């Protein structure tokens, strides 16, 4: 069973300011929690396009959304190809786009996916199981410098150098095949006092490898740029992030688009090309309530930012 608790569901769907006849995009279908809330508000010409590259998520969503057949289209693709995929379907403008950038709970919980540092499983971490690059290749084939860079940048891990060195030493003896083996190596690399504070010692390194395997930050930047272009005036873009790297990208791109270019002094009327592209709806991100965090601890780090196309 595909069980997934949707984070900030009401806040994000309300944030989209849905029109019943509008065209909406859920870039991260997952357990279809957001998609279901969106599609149930659509009537007549309203339509939802939902992206996921996980076949299991798509087949589950097809069943979940079956009462709304005709009002939604499921697209098996990375959301970085949103513009091309929508254009193939004749869609050139939309009224709202939603991103929920958390890894869905079933992906974390399925042992064979290799996302979790709590369970021993093959090193995989691919969102799209048909792609060739997996965590096994990153851990066993990328050189020391590349490993150190991704663990430092994507994991914001202060012991990146020590961890990369320990991985390099370990794989010289034999390939690192499982998440359990990798966790033990990371624990060995981190000084004992640091292991006792700040959560699980492997958390940051696992995040870094997952981001590298799936090019998550590159995909998000491309997709958010496309979303800003495709959204029609008064349409909304809602982004739920779960770590500072993604939140920083969203914050910066929203801020840049809400400023517009510098206007030459002395103009009586501001030309269209100097007007801001977006208006920020949330000056500060919306975060989950204490009640939501109590019900779903994975919501703890979630942040929702909303912008409206001008």
UniProtKB/Swiss-Prot annotation:
HAMAP family: 16SrRNA_methyltr_H. It is found in: Cytoplasm. It comes from the Bacteria. NCBIfam families: 16S rRNA (cytosine(1402)-N(4))-methyltransferase RsmH (TIGR00006). It is an enzyme of class 2 (transferase). S-adenosyl-L-methionine binds at residues 32-34, 52, 79, 100, 107. GO terms for biological process: rRNA base methylation. The gene is rsmH. Keywords: Cytoplasm, Methyltransferase, rRNA processing, S-adenosyl-L-methionine, Transferase. The lineage of its organism: Bacteria, Bacillati, Bacillota, Bacilli, Bacillales. This is Ribosomal RNA small subunit methyltransferase H. Specifically methylates the N4 position of cytidine in position 1402 (C1402) of 16S rRNA.
């Amino acid at each position: 069973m595909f069980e997934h608790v949707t984070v900030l569901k009401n806040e994000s769907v309300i944030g989209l300011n849905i029109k019943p006849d509008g065209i909406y995009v859920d870039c991260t279908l997952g357990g279809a929690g957001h998609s279901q809330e969106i599609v149930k508000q659509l009537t007549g010409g309203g339509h939802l396009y939902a992206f996921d590259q996980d076949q299991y998520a798509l087949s589950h969503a097809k069943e979940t959304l079956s009462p709304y057949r005709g009002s939604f289209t499921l697209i098996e693709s990375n959301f970085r190809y949103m513009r091309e995929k929508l254009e193939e379907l004749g869609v050139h403008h939309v009224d709202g786009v939603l991103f929920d950038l958390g890894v869905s709970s079933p992906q974390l919980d399925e042992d064979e996916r290799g996302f979790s540092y709590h369970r021993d499983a093959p090193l995989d971490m691919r969102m799209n199981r048909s792609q060739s690059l997996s965590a096994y290749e990153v851990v066993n084939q990328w050189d020391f410098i590349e490993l150190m860079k991704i663990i430092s940048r994507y994991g914001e891990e202060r012991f990146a150098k020590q961890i990369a060195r320990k991985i390099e030493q370990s794989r010289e003896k034999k390939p690192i095949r499982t998440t359990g083996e990798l966790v033990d190596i990371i624990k060995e690399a981190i000084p004992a006092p640091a292991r006792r504070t700040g959560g699980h010692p492997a958390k940051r390194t696992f995040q870094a490898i997952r981001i590298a395997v799936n090019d998550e930050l590159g995909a998000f930047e491309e997709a958010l740029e496309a979303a800003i272009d495709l959204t029609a005036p008064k349409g909304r873009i809602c982004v739920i992030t779960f770590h500072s790297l993604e939140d920083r990208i969203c914050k910066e791109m929203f801020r840049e688009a809400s400023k517009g270019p510098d206007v030459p002094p002395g103009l009586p009327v501001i030309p269209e090309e100097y007007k801001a592209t977006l208006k920020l709806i949330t000056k500060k991100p919306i975060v989950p309530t204490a009640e939501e965090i109590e019900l779903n601890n994975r919501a703890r780090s979630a942040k929702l930012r909303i912008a409206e196309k001008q």
